[in-house]
Curated annotation (Swiss-Prot):
Ranges for domain SPX: 1-166
Principal localisation: nucleus
Induction (free text): Up-regulated under phosphate (Pi) starvation in lamina joint cells. Up-regulated during cold stress. Under negative feedback regulation by PHO2. Up-regulated by the transcription factor PHR2.
Pfam assignment, any one: SPX
Disruption phenotype: Slightly increased angles of leaf inclination due to longer lamina joint with greater lengths of both adaxial and abaxial sclerenchyma cells. The double mutant spx1 spx2 has abnormally inclinated leaves. Altered leaf inclination phenotypes of the rli1-1 single mutant are suppressed in the triple mutant spx1 spx2 rli1-1.
The name this protein goes by in its record: SPX domain-containing protein 1
Biased composition (Basic and acidic residues): 204-216
Classification of source organism: Eukaryota, Viridiplantae, Streptophyta, Embryophyta, Tracheophyta
Subcellular compartments: Nucleus
Domain of life, per lineage: Eukaryota
Tissue specificity field: Predominantly expressed in roots and leaves. Localized in leaves lamina joints.
Oligomer status and interactors: Interacts (via SPX domain) with PHR2 (via C-terminus). Interacts with RLI1 in the nucleus to prevents its positive regulation of leaf inclination during phosphate (Pi) starvation.
Gene Ontology biological process terms in this record: cellular response to cold; cellular response to phosphate starvation; negative regulation of unidimensional cell growth; positive regulation of cellular response to phosphate starvation; regulation of leaf development
Note: SPX1 and SPX2 have redundant functions in repressing the activity of PHR2.
Encoding gene per record: SPX1
Organism (species): Oryza sativa subsp. japonica
Length: 295
C-alpha cells in the first residue's frame, strides 16, 4: 500500500480530535507538483556553492530555490511546528494524568473499593492506548517527512533530505523517550492491577466459574446488578475508538519500524519491547465485562 493511502487509513482510525494534527501529505504533494522538473542541477549547485562561500549553508540552500520550492519548504517548517506543539501538549497532559491515576489507584486500594479499582483500571487501559497512538503519531509523521523529501530531491535535483532529517531528529515530536517511559509505567500499573481484584461476571454475587473470567465475548449473558448487559454495550465496547485505534496504531508501528531489505539512514529502529497488536487486544480482553459497560 502506498504511504499516502496508509496515512489516510491511519488518520481515519485515530481519535477524531487528532486528525488535523498529522502531516498534510496531500497538500505537500500538491505543492511539489507546482515545482518544475529537476533540470539545471549543475547550475543550482554552482549557485549554491557561490552563496555558501559568502555566507552559510542555509543561506545557500535558500538562494538556490525557486519561489515554488521556498513555498514548499515553508509548509514543511509549519508542519514541524504543528507536530511539536501537539506532541509537547499531549506529553504534558500525560504526565499529569499518570500521576492522577497513580493517586486514584492508591486511594482505591486503601479503601478496598473494587468498583473504583475497576473504573480506574478501565481508564488506565484507555490511557495506555492513547499513548500508543501518540507513539504512532510520531513514527507516521517522521516517515511521511522522509518520503516527501525523497520526492522533493528527485524532482528538484536538490539534496535537502539528509540535512532536513538531521534537524527533524532533534525535534520534540521525534524525541519519545519520556513517552516510552510513561507507557512502561502505565503497563506496570496494569500488571499490578490485572492479576488481582478480578471480578467474576458470570453471576450476581460475583462468584462464577474462573474459566470465564477473561472471556468477554458474550456480555449479553452476564449479570450486572441482577440484570443483563444490553447488546448495545457490547457493540459500543467493540467499536471503542481507543481499542480500534490502538490496535491499528500498533500494526502500523510494527510495519514502519520492522526490518526491511531497504533499510537506510532514514529508517526508524525496530520496536523495542512494545506490545504487539495481539497483546494489546489481549489486554483489553482482560477487562471484565462489568468494566466494559462502565464508560
Amino acid at each position: 500500500m502506498k504511504f499516502g493511502k496508509s496515512l489516510s487509513s491511519q488518520i481515519v482510525e485515530t481519535l477524531p480530535e487528532w486528525r488535523d494534527k498529522f502531516l498534510s501529505y496531500k497538500d505537500l504533494k500538491k505543492r511539489l507538483k507546482l515545482i518544475g522538473g529537476g533540470g539545471g542541477g549543475e547550475e543550482r549547485q554552482a549557485k549554491r556553492a557561490r552563496v555558501a562561500a559568502d555566507g552559510g549553508e542555509e543561506e545557500a540552500a535558500a538562494a538556490a530555490m525557486t519561489p515554488e520550492e521556498a513555498g514548499f519548504m515553508r509548509l514543511l517548517e509549519a508542519e514541524l511546528d504543528k507536530f511539536n506543539s501537539f506532541f509537547v501538549e499531549k506529553e504534558e497532559e500525560y504526565i499529569i494524568r499518570q500521576k492522577e491515576l497513580q493517586d486514584r489507584v492508591a486511594r482505591a486500594a486503601g479503601r478496598e473499593s473494587k468498583e473504583e479499582l475497576m473504573r480506574v483500571r478501565k481508564e488506565i487501559v484507555d490511557f495506555h492506548g492513547e499513548m500508543v497512538l501518540l507513539e504512532n503519531y510520531s513514527a507516521l509523521n517522521y516517515t511521511g517527512l522522509v518520503k516527501i523529501l525523497k520526492k522533493y530531491d528527485k524532482r528538484t535535483g536538490a539534496l535537502i533530505r539528509l540535512p532536513f532529517i538531521q534537524k527533524v531528529l532533534q525535534q520534540p515530536f521525534f524525541t519519545t523517550d519520556l513517552l516510552y517511559k510513561l507507557v512502561k509505567q502505565c503497563e506496570a500499573m496494569l500488571d499490578q492491577l490485572l492479576p488481582s481484584n478480578e471480578l467474576s461476571v458470570s453471576s450476581e454475587d460475583g462468584r462464577g466459574d474462573s474459566t470465564n473470567e477473561d472471556k468477554p465475548s458474550n456480555p449479553s449473558s452476564s449479570l450486572v446488578n441482577g440484570g443483563t448487559i444490553p447488546e448495545l454495550d457490547e457493540i459500543e465496547y467493540m467499536e471503542s475508538m481507543y481499542m480500534k485505534g490502538t490496535v491499528a496504531a500498533l500494526r502500523s508501528l510494527k510495519e514502519i519500524r520492522s526490518g526491511s531489505s531497504t533499510v537506510s539512514a532514514f529508517s526508524l529502529p525496530p520496536l523495542q519491547g512494545d506490545s504487539s497488536p495481539e497483546e494489546q487486544q489481549e489486554l483489553w480482553n482482560k477487562i471484565p465485562v462489568i468494566e466494559q459497560a462502565a464508560k
